[in-house]
Amino acid sequence: MKRTTLFAIFLPLLAVCTGVFLTSAEDPHQKFKGDDAAMMRWLMGELCTEEGVYFTGSGNCVNCHAPDPDGEALVDENGHTVSPVVDWQATMMANSARDPFWKAKVAHEGLVNPEHRESIENVCTACHAPQGFHEAHLTGTAGPNGYTMADLADDALGLDGVGCAACHTIDDINLAGRSNGDLPINPENVAWGGFENPWDGLMSGQTGFIPVYGEHMRNSEVCASCH
C-alpha cells in the first residue's frame, strides 16, 4: 500500500520534471513572449521618463529599444535578446549614480576634506551622473560649487546614471583629449548612433531627439573623458 502511494506521488512529479527539462533542452533561450510582456511593462514603469533641455530619461527610449513581447524584434536568429535596454540595465553604467560603494567613497572624501566637499561632489557627479550634471551646468541651474550629491538626490535625470542620452549626445570634438567628464554635449537634441541613414520619424516624434549617424560612436574615444 505504501509503495503504491509513493509511486502515485513520484510518477506525476517525474513527468513535471521531465517536461521542464525537455522544454529547457529544446529552447534554452526562450524568446521574449507571454509573461515577458510584464517585464516590458516593468521596464517602462521603472525607468526615468524625465525630460530636460539637453537630455531625456531612458524610460522614453524603452518603447522602441526594449524587448519585443512577441519575440519578433530585437532578438537574433536563436531568440537571444539584443535589446540595448536589457543589456544596459544590468551594468554599472545604469547604476552609476546609485552605487552605494561610490556614494560611500564620495561621502568619505567629503568628511576628509570638508572645505572642498561640494567641489569634490561636482567632480564625481560629472561621470557618475552626467545627465544631471551637464543639464544643470548647461542650463545655469547648478549651484556656486557645482552639481552636488544633494542636487543628485532629487534629480531623476541624474539618478538615471549614464543613461542613453548621456552617451548618444556626445559630439565628435577632441574626444581623445578630454578628461574628468568634460563631455561636448550636442545642443540641438541630436542623438548620434552607429547606423547609417537612420529613419528619424518615430524617434524624433517620441523623444524629441533626432537620430543621426556618427562614426565616432563606434570608437572608444567616446568613453575617454570618464574612462
Where are these regions (language model features)?
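Intrinsic low-complexity, intrinsically disordered segments enriched in polar/basic residues
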Residues: 6-9, 93
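Positively charged n-region of N-terminal signal peptides that target proteins for export
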Residues: 1-5
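Ca2+-coordinating acidic residues in Ca2+-binding motifs
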Residues: 166
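Bacterial N-terminal signal peptides
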Residues: 9-19
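Sequence context of c-type cytochrome heme-c attachment sites
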Residues: 23-160, 169-218, 225
